[in-house]
Amino acid sequence: MSRVADIPTATVGRVVTYIRVLEELEAQNVLRASSGELARRAGVTPFQVRKDLTYFGRFGTRGIGYTVAVLRRELLRALGLDQTWNVVIVGMGRLGHAIANYPGASDYQFQNVGLFDVAPDVVGREVRGLTIQHMSQLGPFVASVAGTPRQVDMGLLTVPAEHAQAAAQALVAAGVGGILNFAPVVLQTQDLHLPEAFAAPGRREVTVENVDFLAGMKRLAFYMLGPQAGPAEE
């Protein structure tokens, strides 16, 4: 398998799609699949499928294809989805509640271990067995579970845009090195560095994924203009 830093982001995104396709094939009791079949279902070319998979190992047999269950298992392992990832959610409004209540995350070893907010009418409520804590308790909570099976790996931000950067900095200061940001603002990652006490040797970078569903709608709007799309007349 190639080093993580050498694998293009777009490739990782497509591999996530391949895993979904493989799951669908398994549900249909399909035992083997060709790169052509995977490509057709994923909306890419067979060459692209084969190229993407070479980053993660050697799979399949020419003329026979891939064993669906084996390829799915190996891709899950390659993406680290064969191990548990503990998650805290910061911001328990409607979106935070929806994510906390979503059962599918646990299928991929993502476990919610902490919920946080600042609103007095929200703090203290219970969601799926977890009590929502005040944001001021984030650091002590993360420290209290460090080195245990409940150690926090990722933070999900579902806070208003104006509070996102500060919330991200609070997560990083507590030692959380991965952030999935649902707030409608791009986090300034140059300001996010893990404290030396929490960072691996030679690595203090924080991994941030910004999720913007409106971006998808904007792209869709453009493509729906059709082939005649062009600059507006002045």
Curated annotation (Swiss-Prot):
The keyword DNA-binding applies. Modulates transcription in response to changes in cellular NADH/NAD(+) redox state. GO terms for biological process: negative regulation of DNA-templated transcription; response to redox state. NCBIfam families: PRK05472.2-3, PRK05472.2-4, PRK05472.2-5. It is found in: Cytoplasm. Its main location: cytoplasm. One of its GO terms (molecular function) is DNA-binding transcription factor activity. Keywords: Cytoplasm, DNA-binding, NAD, Repressor, Transcription, Transcription regulation. One of its GO terms (cellular component) is cytoplasm. HAMAP family: Rex. Pfam families: CoA_binding (PF02629), Put_DNA-bind_N (PF06971). It comes from Deinococcus radiodurans (strain ATCC 13939 / DSM 20539 / JCM 16871 / CCUG 27074 / LMG 4051 / NBRC 15346 / NCIMB 9279 / VKM B-1422 / R1). This is Redox-sensing transcriptional repressor Rex. Belongs to the transcriptional regulatory Rex family. Residues 17-56 bind DNA. Homodimer. NAD(+) binds at residues 91-96. InterPro entries: CoA-bd, NAD(P)-bd_dom_sf, Rex_DNA-bd_C_dom, Tscrpt_rep_Rex, WH-like_DNA-bd_sf, WH_DNA-bd_sf.
